[in-house]
């Protein structure tokens, strides 16, 4: 920036004569050599000539806007240029704010002023260099400041200036799309006509002005907070709108196919194949209720109403209940009713009867042998199973064992049978009979004696007749 740039000069409200100011110096302190009276006399003489020091220029709030930024930029740029080239500085000229031309992009919507606002330059000095001090405000400025501090005492003298302090009515937002969304081909649009400041102002009393000065800062604060909340809530919507605007018509047409697409439903039919079950669950395992549905879609409640077991031969519920009773020692289970097998039309189901008999035999085999303590001393079963002498076996081959056809009483016949098998008879025949039947049971269960009887055939008797004891 060259030294020929015109710097802002001090403009006095009462005098249009320019006063020189030294660049880079804000003010001149009062000299200690002069007394108070001399300084006051000098100030009075200078005020008579129209020279005022430390003048304060009051601007209305509506004029304190972003429109003053270009003026400040010009002022700051000139200060930097004069500081860099102080030797090239020339006498300053008077510049009016209204005569400054702003750039094309910066409009002047708030430049209407009732009073022309003057920006003062650097503080002036006296030519002789003595009694350097700051300028004092003009009497009119002092009265205006006092009226601001105590508006009741002003008696409406500055009522028009106070009306200038009131904020104009808030203009509604412009209609239509924002400038960012308009096409460049449309050309620049002229801004809508703005109403004059005087038409929007209302004549208010001093009390209303005081209340407005108090309430306006609070309203502005609330307005800013609500604007921030609206901006934060609309961020997501604005992003979505921006994303939609980035697509072309062809891309939007392609994106519509996403919603229009429908998947094809393919029904997969299960293929049933025969297989061998690898794992057979045991009794008492937890049923997972993972069942393959029947082809006829009939719910048979497997696992709920009947036991779910893989083998084809299902267990009998009565036999299972008897096994549980035999294994448990719970008194509550033992006190329940004993299960009874019920078979309808037994004459038509002989296989069910045979199965029941075989199940009962297997159940009794699994039961542990009961231990009986006899009152009298009796021989054990192993001793009674010893082989008989050879002479007795030869006699038995020719002589038949007495049958129940003997003309004797039942007690006598029992004693004869017990003596043949070498079982002593005591006071109680029940213990002796229990030992004799236990001996016969051991013979029937012994595979050795069963094979021996089948080989010898013992006079043509078969195994079926050997299992029966005739009394």
Swiss-Prot record:
One GO cellular component, as annotated: cilium
Keyword annotations from UniProtKB, A to Z: Cell projection, Cilium, Cytoplasm, Cytoskeleton, Transport
Protein family: Belongs to the IFT46 family.
Lineage, uppermost ranks: Eukaryota, Metazoa, Ecdysozoa, Nematoda, Chromadorea
Gene name tied to this protein: dyf-6
Subunit architecture: Component of the IFT complex B composed of at least che-2, che-13, dyf-1, dyf-3, dyf-6, dyf-11, dyf-13, ift-20, ift-74, ift-81, ifta-2, osm-1, osm-5 and osm-6.
A single BP term in Gene Ontology: intraciliary transport
Regions of compositional bias (Acidic residues) in chain numbering: 89-99, 231-246
Region span, Disordered: 1-202, 226-246
Location in the cell: Cell projection, Cilium; Cytoplasm, Cytoskeleton, Cilium basal body; Cell projection, Dendrite; Perikaryon
Stretches assigned to coiled coil: none
Principal cellular location given in the protein's record: other
Tissues expressing this chain: Expressed in the hypodermis and sensory neurons including inner labial, PDE, amphid and phasmid neurons.
Cited function: Component of the intraflagellar transport (IFT) complex B required for transport of proteins in the motile cilium. May be required for ciliary entrance and transport of specific ciliary cargo proteins such as che-3 which are related to motility. Required for normal morphology and function of ciliated amphid sensory neurons.
Record InterPro entries: Intraflagellar_transp_cmplxB
Summary of the knockout phenotype: Shorter and compacted dendritic endings of the amphid and phasmid neurons with an abnormal distribution of the intraflagellar transport protein osm-6 along these ciliated endings. Defective chemotaxis with 78% of mutants exhibiting reduced tracking to the chemoattractant ammonium chloride.
Protein's recorded name: Intraflagellar transport protein 46 homolog
Species of provenance: Caenorhabditis elegans
Short name of one Pfam family: IFT46_B_C
Superkingdom, natural source: Eukaryota
